[in-house]
Amino acid sequence: MFNKDIGIDLGTANVLIYIKGQGIVLNEPSVVAIDADTKRPLAVGSEAHEMLGRTPGKVKAIKPMKDGVIADYDTTEVMLNYFIKKINGKSFFSRPRILICCPSNITQVEKNAIKEAAERTGAKKVFLEEEPKVAAIGAGMDISKPSGNMVIDIGGGTTDIAILSLGGIVNSASIRIAGNAFDNDIVKYIKNKYKLLVGERTAEDIKISIGTVFPGSRNEKMEVRGRDLVTGLPHTITLTSDEVEEALRESVYTIIHAVKGDRKSVV
């Protein structure tokens, strides 16, 4: 057994784990399935994600992260423990040093919760770093120079916007509109226009498969199956990329407005 340095992107939608020298070794949804009666964890990650919207009454699928921060501390700890044990079995290390990405502008209490959850997995030492800075370095930006670099990191729960220079963040903003909000926008759009009820997994599939935020930039279609709210029966519609763009427009404009505000504050 030997120590390793690992990086964790503890996202609202997904958890990614990077091991120094090996690259990304885990990328799974931030979901835990529990027994609703006993609260006992039944599945974590990809296996639990398959249960979203499909679980019987006794099984509850939980997303312990909300808007980039811990919403359910105990479940987050269970999830982190599971993922670290999973990669530990493959990589043969003990008590790693862990770097965790966190959204900019979260409170000290929220930072402490993330750090404590990681420490309870047996980490030797835990470091926190703001997501925009990590994203910039990962994208190959040289943030040590006196010139400005802007990063827009659209995650599952938050969009982090930052201007970086001389190795640090000059100004930043974090808004709680991101990938999950896009999924909800799609669900609402289909419900309002077609009187069809679809789940969040279906909405995410639509977003990934035919989604766009630029009008006319993508011309694809997808058959979408859901429950007709009038008849109560299963029904299938055909959705286009233009419709997805329309569904996402308001949320995208909110992000653009935040980006313009962040840029103006340092000009």
Identify the residue ranges that each predicted region occupies.
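Nucleotide/phosphate-binding catalytic cleft detector across ATP-hydrolyzing
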Residues: M1-I154, A162-V267
